[in-house]
Amino acid sequence: MITEDIRYIGVNDHDIDLFEGQYQVPNGISYNSYVIMDEKIAIMDTVDKRKQTEFLGNLETALAGRTPDYLVISHMEPDHASSIQAVVERYPEITLVGNAKTFPMLKLYFDLDTSRALTVKEGDTLKLGRHELTFVMAPMVHWPEVMVSYDSCDK
């Protein structure tokens, strides 16, 4: 638990020995994902498919019977995004949140209906209840579609 209503649902991967196939990680890596529990629920990224089952279990535990409203996609690289399909299959009413570069990339990885997608741009906000996310574009920090989210409630 990060705060009363922000929960870590990521997974540690101690089985991997190379990050991105080239960087040695003798202790493995962490796939970070969070869920914000508010009037509306937002999942912040997913995890690598290698740890998808554990991630979905963590998500289900955190949700405690509730259904998520949004999946915020801040980065399309597989270690952040390869469990998107599984989340959408489990929660078909979920709205995918990304920027203008996210959704064309999403279609390259998954066969998903993006009619429930919400495209955000620099400075847009998403009100969840007490929590309000502000989106900041960070292109080429790593990949061209990268964005970050700022929660004005818990900073």
Language-model features: locations:
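Short coil/turn connectors at secondary-structure junctions
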Residues: 39-40, 67-68, 92-93, 113-115, ...
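Metallo-beta-lactamase
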Residues: 1-4, 98-146
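Active-site metal-binding motif and surrounding structural segment of the metallo-beta-lactamase
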Residues: 50-97
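Short, flexible, glycine/charge-rich loop motifs used to bind or transfer phosphoryl groups or to couple energy/partner
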Residues: 23-24, 32, 60-62, 86-87, ...
